[in-house]
Design a protein with these regions (language model features):
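Short alpha-helical elements
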Residues: 1-294
């Protein structure tokens, strides 16, 4: 019987061929534990927000599940899964190009997230396609803002609420400084003969800066960003399109239902981002399942 948080077998079959072969884990010894069981254990961690040691025994030893999560982060498996799913959704016409939305959200960090070395002796990386690659920052993307100790998550989604890219910074950093960075981390592969950038890009007043508007103009994208009080009024502002921006806030709300994302427990930023990729994979699979006609 399938338990809560576990992946439906029909959706599992879509990504099973993309995972490393269970008998080839890169070293000597016994074959890997069953991928499906391990993945369900990782999904349980994502949704429950519990410590690794509290993982139910039905998913195997917690060390095994934790090691598999880290191995797939280091070899780029998580990022490749999300990239493949987004490309599959793109081919089916499920990704909108009319309006993309950018936003940032403060994530409170638990005291357990503090204490990692500022300069770890060995490289900590999130591997995968170029847009997903991340080197562990010295700050571990942790800092103090008005919301307290935490991380700021910058993200971009399309007009159906499908998350396309993510980046993390210390909580006190302003979102306007990382607009181009999060856009560069969009994981949708470019297909020849198809427009890549959207017709419109929506953001709140925090993105009303000259360098952002220049970037949008350079890429042929219309900005749907309200001006601040100290700026000239934008007579071409599309108020009706701006109302659609709430899709990114609804998407953030869905992801924050995953307790491991709503509060940061990971000491390393690369592990926290990897959990976001796991959540993106799960949500993309749901969209893919809804789009199935066979």
């Amino acid at each position: 019987m399938r338990r809560r948080y576990e992946l439906h077998p029909r959706l599992w079959k879509k990504i099973e061929p993309l995972l490393p072969h269970p008998t080839h884990h890169g070293g000597p010894g016994r074959p890997w534990h069953d991928h499906y069981t391990i993945l369900n254990g990782i999904l349980w961690m994502l949704h429950s927000g519990a410590p690794w040691r509290d993982l139910p025994e039905r998913y195997g030893p917690w060390q095994t599940v934790y090691d598999r999560f880290n191995r797939w982060r280091k070899d780029g498996t998580w990022a490749r899964l999300v990239t493949w799913l987004l490309d599959h959704l793109q081919r089916r016409g499920c990704l909108g190009r009319d309006l993309w939305c950018v936003d940032a959200s403060i994530i409170r960090a638990s005291h357990a997230a503090a204490g990692a070395k500022k300069n770890p002796g060995r490289a900590r990386v999130l591997a995968g396609p170029k847009a997903a690659q991340l080197q562990e920052p010295p700050s571990h993307a942790l800092g103090y803002s008005q919301g307290g100790f935490g991380t700021k998550v910058h993200l971009v989604c399309e007009d159906h609420g499908i998350l396309l890219g993510i980046y993390v910074t210390p909580g006190q950093r302003h979102e306007s400084q990382f607009f181009e960075t999060v856009i560069e981390r969009v994981l949708v592969p470019h297909r020849r003969g198809q427009r890549y950038w959207p017709e419109r890009m929506a953001g709140d007043k925090g993105y009303s800066y000259r360098h952002i508007r220049r970037w949008l103009k350079r890429h042929g994208t219309r900005g749907v960003i309200p001006t601040r009080k100290n700026q000239p009024r934008d007579l071409g502002f599309e108020k009706a399109q701006y109302r659609r921006r709430n899709i990114v806030e609804r998407a953030i709300g869905w992801y924050k239902e995953c307790r491991h994302l709503a509060t940061r427990y990971d000491k390393l930023a690369v592990n926290y981002v990897a959990f976001w990729l796991v959540a993106m994979m799960e949500r993309d699979l749901r969209f893919l399942g809804l789009s199935d006609t066979d």
